[in-house]
Every structure is written in structure tokens, then in C-alpha cells.
Amino acid sequence: YAPSALVLTIGQGATAAESGVQRAVTLTCTPKSSGTHPDAKGACTQLRAAGGDFDKVTRIKSDTVCTKEWNPTVVTAEGVWDGRRISYEHTFANPCMAKAGKGLVFEF
């Protein structure tokens, strides 16, 4: 099997470089779901369904209603997914948008 092991973070700021890490967890999906993620099995299932595409995981539904304030929340994923190196970063405009778009993967 190809390894899948990640470190996931959530921070307050426009980019990972500008923000402090507020929360961080580990997520391993093969050979079995594990790590410090509170729902490792659910997060791995969601990532597998998305084919490891984090943009699909963080996609916000078009009918989401949030304020238009700029109070950015950034999420990151670093590590290996299905044997490929991953370095992912996504910035949500505010905590409401982050809650709407983080999916199970960034729910910690």
C-alpha cells in the first residue's frame, strides 16, 4: 500500500506564513485510519471520496450565507497522500466560511 500520513493545521490569518497555528492534528489513512484527529475514519473516508483533492474537501456550497467580513482562517495539510507529497493551503474569508467549507478533514 502507498502511505498516507498528514499533519493538518488551522490558523488565524491570510496565509500560513502570517498566522500562528491554533490547532494541529495528525491523520494517517493507510494501512488504517489513525492519528490525533478526533474523527480519523471520517476524515480519511472524505479524503478518499475526493481522490485526495483537498480543493474538493474545502469547497463551499453556493447557497452558504455568511457575513462579508475579512477575518481570515487558513487551513493546511502537509505530508504524504497515497504515496505523493502534499503541501496544501487554503484561506477562508472568515470563520463562518471556514465552518461551512472545512469538511470532516479540518474539523478539529
UniProtKB/Swiss-Prot annotation:
* Domain of life (superkingdom): Bacteria
Cellular localisation: Secreted
Per the record, where is site Reactive bond? K68, E69
PROSITE patterns per record: SSI
Task: Please name the GO terms that the record assigns under molecular function.
Answer: serine-type endopeptidase inhibitor activity
* Any one annotated GO CC term: extracellular region
The record's principal subcellular location, in a coarse class, is: secreted
For this chain, the family text in UniProt reads: Belongs to the protease inhibitor I16 (SSI) family.
Provide the disulphide bond pattern: C29-C44, C66-C96
Q: Which InterPro entries match?
A: Prot_inh_I16_SSI, Prot_inh_SSI_I16_CS, Subtilisin_inhibitor, Subtilisin_inhibitor-like_sf
Xref: Gene3D superfamilies: Subtilisin inhibitor-like
Provide the protein name: Protease inhibitor SIL-V3
Q: How does this protein assemble?
A: Homodimer.
User: Mind telling me which Pfam families this protein's record contains?
Assistant: SSI (PF00720)
Question: What keywords were assigned to this record?
Answer: Disulfide bond, Protease inhibitor, Secreted, Serine protease inhibitor
